[in-house]
Amino acid sequence: MRKSYRVKKETEFQQVFETRNSYANRQFVIYVLEKPGQPHFRVGISVGKKIGNAVARNWVKRRIRQSITELKPQLKQDADFLVIARPTVAGKSQAETKAYLSHALKLAHLLDND
């Protein structure tokens, strides 16, 4: 995923958090900020220390990024969103992570059901 598709700065994270527009399942919390006219979506990923050590957290982040890359054609383009991983996602396979993430994105109305 290219840098232009990522929310990186703390101020950008805060803008999305301040909307208080969140959706959740047992594995992920999704915060959404609608940005009409934006050429493509941007995503920020947050994995807390409750997930495990740095290796485990980076592993979870890689799986989330891979899932988003695979779901990219179906994602709503005019929004910034944050994906916050909950501890229950640790140790899940790539297929399970993608399924849980797609469920959370559908709850947030960010995923088209083509």
From Swiss-Prot:
Signal peptide location: none
A GO BP entry: tRNA 5'-leader removal
Gene Ontology cellular component list: ribonuclease P complex
Catalytic activity entry: Endonucleolytic cleavage of RNA, removing 5'-extranucleotides from tRNA precursor
EC number(s) stated in the UniProt entry for this protein: 3.1.26.5
Record keywords, A-Z: Endonuclease, Hydrolase, Nuclease, RNA-binding, tRNA processing
SS bonds (residue pairs): none
Pfam families in the cross-refs: Ribonuclease_P
GO molecular function per UniProt: 3'-tRNA processing endoribonuclease activity; ribonuclease P activity; tRNA binding
Record flagged with keyword Signal: no
Superkingdom of origin: Bacteria
The protein's assembly and partners: Consists of a catalytic RNA component (M1 or rnpB) and a protein subunit.
Function text: RNaseP catalyzes the removal of the 5'-leader sequence from pre-tRNA to produce the mature 5'-terminus. It can also cleave other RNA substrates such as 4.5S RNA. The protein component plays an auxiliary but essential role in vivo by binding to the 5'-leader sequence and broadening the substrate specificity of the ribozyme.
Protein family per UniProt: Belongs to the RnpA family.
PANTHER family linked: RIBONUCLEASE P PROTEIN COMPONENT (PTHR33992:SF1)
Name by which UniProt lists this protein: Ribonuclease P protein component
Source species of the chain: Lactiplantibacillus plantarum (strain ATCC BAA-793 / NCIMB 8826 / WCFS1) (Lactobacillus plantarum)
Lineage: Bacteria, Bacillati, Bacillota, Bacilli, Lactobacillales
Gene field: rnpA
